[in-house]
Amino acid sequence: MKDINEGKITKEDALELLTCLWIKTLTINKVRSQSHTLSSAGSPMYQNVTIGGQTTDKKDAVNELSFVVLQSVAQTRLTQPNLTVRYHANIDKHFFDECIEVMKLGFGMPALNNDEIIIPSFINWGVKEEDAYNYSAIGCVETAVPGKWGYRCTGMSYINFPRVLLCAMNDGVDLTSGKRFTKGYGKFTEMETYEDLLAAWDKTVREMTRYSVIVENAIDKASERDVPDVLCSALTDDCIGRGKTIKEGGAVYDFISGLQVGIANMADSLAAIKKLVYEEKKITKEQLWNAILDDFQSEENKKIQEMLINDVPKYGNDDDYVDQLVVEAYDSYLDEIKKYPNTRYHRGPIGGIRYGGTSSISANVGQGMGTIATPDGRNAFEPLAEGSSPAHNADKNGPTAVFKTVAKLPTEKITGGVLLNQKMTPQMLSTEENKQKLEMLIRTFFNRLHGYHVQYNIVSRETLIDAQKHPEKHKDLIVRVAGYSAFSVSYTHLTLPTIL
């Protein structure tokens, strides 16, 4: 913008430079293992550009460059880099209108993060105010202070909530592998009350969280020794001043968020067990357990599956019955993860600790492939729910109900990101009136409900179905996954159906 103001380049020149940069960014890729590919469908590289936001005196930070960046991303319509807009209550109205217009183009950008929840959360963790107001998105939905953050802001392992629940119900033995995962706290068929089950969950998820930290710390130490990242360290404050690489504790801040998969499946499973088994006694513990092991295949077990799916409140519908159950169960994990510092703790950075985060990327597909049937009626090896979004086909009361459910999560503790995917058809935004309704819906989610994040897939179901059948006809179709956009033809055959 300085060069434009000084007459060295025109606005059109700046727009061309940015579009060339985005095209160059798209050429970066890397070869991944099969397991990594399942967790990162579409070959994302996680570059993220952030615009919008506010200054420390709460003035809107939108400027002419914000519009140019938005225009350049809309013009190229590529999958990289990601574009994130920092929303706040006083965001420029014209700029926000333009953001909605770009969303309507249907390539999943921009995503929206909420300053009103993220900035206070950072400050509570010890981030200086001026740095908290300068945060940006990194990767998918994670947030960090640019140029001052540790070498990773998110976890290297996933806690598969539904699989942990099944393990808790089976005295610590994993039903997929047959291996003992934890000490064991009883069998479901012998648990007399819902509170007994919840106690087993609490102990099991804490134990699994501890194991995940042990694994991550081992990886961190090996990475510190073998991959020092000298160039990255030279560009990060205060590595040179401390004489340490970013992996030795040279950064100003160093926080890591844990990752979880299947939050909604866990919620719906707990609701099904509590309501149908313990309260209404429509299903015995033995019947439910046998139905799970049978993958709901027999005629009798198919009827049980129908009850689990249709006769129980579901996460995503603003029903306190199930929403409060997930908050209670989730708190066990959030309370445990914060106990474990990372390997840079007390080596220089502010922080050096862990907090929650729900960025599952596309691991809900791979993790689902290793998880047998679950008490919510999901069949064995099907994908799990991603991020903080409802399970597939579970939300029946519209987007407002989904927003109200997600807002009940302890967002202030989940600083690593509360990822929410929403879907709309292009026809729903075909009129100015409907566009304004979407804008008001987002404002309500952020201003009144204090949501963390939302992103949209605006593409018709018919287009997605045809892309499945005839991918060669849709090579330019871009859809949003858990925190990033990718060409539909780059997804595995398992990932695209989860977007449907």
Question: Language-model features: where?
Answer:
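Conserved catalytic cores of very large enzyme subunits
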Residues: 1-494, 500
